[in-house]
């Protein structure tokens, strides 16, 4: 039973702040084994956030409902992907690859990082608020969350780890093609309840992932934990954008 539970618990612990390690002994190698479940974890976070938007939009302005949804997602994940986005955006202003990797290790956030963080949070809040007007935020949030976490898998599989030494992203260095394919299949299945909007959003997330893969290879020489987290966040936001456009 532990061989089944540990990978699932590892996926939850890797992507959220749920303290599953208190009850289940999670090991580093379990993260790669449970990576195909990343979309399911993302769906749970995105669906919960969207549900908050759907419910609170009944008595709050939609932008406020969307803001509460973003806050809940940040609380559940410890703002993990937002932090990664800020660090990656800050690194884009570096003079060379080595300096970029050094910036991503620094806990300080520069102007690029702050700008990226504010813009994405505001955009997410506006999009979830717009979806809540028609009570679609939960289903679309679920699909977008799954697509965003699925984006981690092909990047970690296809690109080398750019930073010497250990790091969170290196836990995914042992991913296999079957795990990646299974994770993508799970994300597609989770997009189906949202209909065309969910599938269009998943396609947008895939396109963003491809673009960021080329950018990461060119700028950083591969991926880091921050690059993976930033990709998950941007892919999720892209999925929300296209889903809203599809439903408009």
Locations of the language-model features?
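Hydrophobic alpha-helical transmembrane segments
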Residues: 1-78, 82, 92-99, 106-248
